[in-house]
A protein has these predicted regions:
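Substrate-binding cleft/loops of secretory-pathway carbohydrate-active enzymes
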Residues: 202-227, 245-252, 279-294
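Boundary/entry segment of secreted carbohydrate-active catalytic domains
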Residues: 25-75, 102
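C-terminal segment of classical bacterial N-terminal signal peptides
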Residues: 15-22
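Structural preference for beta-strand elements that scaffold enzyme active sites
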Residues: 27-33, 64-68, 93-99, 142-146, ...
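Active-site groove signature of glycoside hydrolases
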Residues: 131-168, 195-203, 226-240, 301-309
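Acidic (Asp/Glu)-rich catalytic clusters
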Residues: 52-62, 80-97, 132-140, 182-189, ...
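Substrate-binding cleft of secreted/luminal carbohydrate-active enzymes
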Residues: 30-37, 229-240, 263-337
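Substrate-binding cleft of extracellular glycoside hydrolase catalytic domains
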Residues: 79, 84-191, 278-286
């Protein structure tokens, strides 16, 4: 047998039988999250039109496993809107994910730092109860809960112009803060799968960040009795070191997988506020996908197409190359080829 073929076979068998190797799905799970922030935040103009039987994203919908709903949208949505969303997603067989702050600190706390509405990443048990209750009342189930950047906003964040001050809480304090909020969701939806999103640029570069990421994953498992189900990477694409930071955090996440502290990794493919048109935003998102999975050979478990910026203004139709759902179709075509 050719020595190169033999070596390749041995390497493949080593991966198959390596007990520390993380499980990898045959194909990634596709998540979709149009912008849906309440005023004055941006929202896709056709967001609610997506949840009708003839909505023009049928191919994308048939291959989307998870629809991502944002906490700020859910706290202001009417019950009728939630009924419409849940009914349509159930009909399509698409699971619901909720991305929301979970560090249990109320608005304007006595400490003067953190808090719901002051700093991203925070929430309350009351907010969690409202979201869970109304999704359940609509006949729905939250399959995935995406904690909104608890490590960054709880531990590292200082303050942004016009925003509240960060608390610089210890990792142990953050773990204690998330527990009451997460308990609300797990009590309402016992099968809920809990993970998080973190901003890679603002994690990599912090002093001792690899140790902090490991300590955070340890603290989460100790607090909740199971490892983080997933980590989604929020990449600062326009920054000079944005991609390198993302790759560093991706590698750290793989280390967590090998240590059974993390189950799956996801990458958010999007544009940025620097992209001032729908066409520019979509092109950037496609370029980022090709960069990470083509050039850098990443194989994330979750592929997430998500926007929280003014573009793209439309989610549909999927035949419009400048609409968000067209990214799902483009990804499917790439996989087939």
């Amino acid at each position: 047998m050719n020595s190169k073929i033999l070596a390749a076979c041995i390497s493949a068998l080593a991966l198959v039988f390596d007990p520390t190797a993380p499980a990898r799905a045959a194909s990634p799970e596709i998540w979709l999250g149009p912008e849906e922030l309440p005023p004055p935040g941006p929202s896709a103009v056709d967001l609610m039109d997506m949840f009708t039987p003839d909505a023009p994203w049928k191919t994308a919908a048939a291959h989307t496993q998870v629809f991502l709903l944002q906490g700020p949208f859910l706290t202001r949505a009417t019950q009728d809107q939630l009924n419409t969303i849940v009914t349509d997603l159930k009909r399509r067989g698409i699971a619901i994910a909720v991305a929301v702050g979970v560090m249990n600190v109320p608005h304007d706390p006595p400490s003067g730092c953190g808090g719901l509405g002051n700093v991203e990443g925070y929430g309350t048990v009351q907010q969690a109860a409202k979201i869970a209750r109304e999704i359940k009342a609509a006949g729905g189930e939250i399959k995935y809960l995406v904690m909104d950047e608890p490590l960054y906003y709880g531990h590292y964040y200082t303050q942004a112009p016009g925003k509240g001050a960060g608390c610089h809480s210890s990792i142990e304090q953050i773990a204690k803060l998330i527990k009451p909020t997460l308990d609300v969701y797990t009590q309402t939806f016992p099968n809920i799968v809990i993970g998080e999103v973190e901003p890679t640029f603002f994690i990599d570069g912090q002093a001792n960040w690899q140790s902090d990421v490991s300590s955070w994953a340890d603290a989460y498992r100790e607090t909740m009795g199971k490892p983080l189900a997933f980590l989604h990477l929020d990449v600062e694409w326009p920054l000079a070191n944005g991609v390198q930071d993302a790759l560093a955090v991706y590698n750290a996440a793989q280390d967590l997988q090998h240590r059974n502290l993390l189950e799956k990794i996801g990458v958010i493919y999007n544009g940025s506020r620097a992209d001032k048109s729908d066409a520019a935003w979509i092109k950037a998102a496609r370029d980022h996908l090709l960069l990470m999975e083509g050039q850098h050979k990443l194989r994330p478990d979750h592929v997430i197409f998500e926007s929280w910026t003014p573009n793209p203004t439309h989610a549909m139709p999927e035949t419009d190359p400048n609409a968000l759902t067209s990214l799902v179709d483009a990804y499917l075509n790439r996989m087939r080829n």
